[in-house]
């Protein structure tokens, strides 16, 4: 990965965090490392406090793009939908704490058979209205544990939302920085192409006057066409990142293209990054927190499945009125009620309870393994991003030296040409063309070096993004 992607990653991962779970450590099958493999002056043993990490770019356009993405991105909308669904599931389970009450009203006409008893055949009718109630008393905690599981799932959905927001900001920033890099590279290539066209014109004039061979013209054309050949690829890359940003912003490319077609710059940013300690940092990542909460939910469901082995106690009852004549329905003599506590204990159901418990246990084990896998992946991603960011800083420093040396070489050649003006005109024209060819090459390199430093700064920012994921 290049330097751009790793730098900004680090900043994001550190910033978008939540409180550390108290139960996380008991699920870890291997203790977290006490320190990062990467340490030193580039990283600090502190945790970041700013969730809006992208504001460090000091780019108002990027700020507005991320704000727009938060409002319009469909992944964010779906994450919000999942939170709403998890909240609804929580209230569905909570409703089991309360009695179920129903209202009944009706008119009944019945006729008894005269051939089933010694009584004559009779016809009767009556009106009735009543309230009925059924209430499961959660004595052994089955309902309570299922409510706890839904609480954990609800919390996990919020962590997933946080993770979506982190990823969205990272993807927008990465695409934006890559776009800016390609736009600057395109400007450099176009400038080089213009200078190479000038050299080609001069070379053709010299060829027509017999001062140079046709090989010189062919070489000048080869350099020019090679430079021009890279332009379509850069333009295609620019279009690709514009369409990527359009999708992230929930828009069509034509709606956002006018805003992004003009090139821009980002500041060169190489200050130390606060990463804290692994035990503090990793357990605060949204993906790690979500995995931990999923373990808690499965543990609660296992407890609920075990509680299903125990008796269930119900309290049932009804209160109402019944009378043959509608006018007598509300009289005290028409009042009826029923109270019927009951106990229901399943002692055999073909192994359903046993296998339900086995299923819950297997799902808990799977969630624990997923949690440990998530932690290991988080350690790997963070270490890789930190290593890449450190090497990116070294690369930036080296490229700056190359740029400085290129500028010195260019200045030397210009000064040398200026001194040649003291020579004869014929000798001057011959050497000026030679130097123009060489200066064109050096100009290409120096302009490239001059832009490489900010481009590498872009890469450094993108590396910081990955450390924060």
PLM regions with names:
Residues 22-23, 243-244, 253, 267-269, ...:
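Acidic, low-complexity, intrinsically disordered peripheral segments
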Residues 20-89, 266-296, 346, 375, ...:
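Bacterial Sec-pathway N-terminal export signals of envelope proteins
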Residues 78-93, 164, 170-190, 198, ...:
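Amphipathic alpha-helical coiled-coil segments
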Residues 77, 97-121, 134-163, 182, ...:
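Small/polar (Gly/Ser/Thr/Ala-rich) solvent-exposed segments
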Residues 62-64, 85, 126-128, 174, ...:
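Transmembrane beta-barrel architecture of outer-membrane proteins
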Residues 38-58, 67, 105-132, 255-274, ...:
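Small/polar, glycine/serine/threonine/aspartate-rich low-complexity segments that form flexible
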Residues 1-28:
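Bacterial Sec-dependent N-terminal signal peptides
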Residues 29, 143, 152, 158-277, ...:
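Periplasmic alpha-helical coiled-coil/stalk elements that build and connect Gram-negative outer-membrane
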